[in-house]
């Protein structure tokens, strides 16, 4: 899967779950499960409930995503 195939969406973190997983509500109203991307994990970026995030979704599984950006 190339980078062109991913779907980028905005959302809000609802809940922090174990193993760096998060419950995220997208702007469309859908709730998904998301994990932190490698760059955010390497730079120790903290993600807390209420944060606005950008999520990449795979076209194969729209219920899971990767958090690629935390808005300030």
UniProtKB/Swiss-Prot annotation:
It is found in: Cytoplasm. HAMAP family: IF_1. GO terms for molecular function: ribosome binding; rRNA binding; translation initiation factor activity. This is Translation initiation factor IF-1. Residues 1-72 form the S1-like domain. The gene is infA. Gene3D superfamilies: Nucleic acid-binding proteins. It holds the Pfam family eIF-1a. Belongs to the IF-1 family.
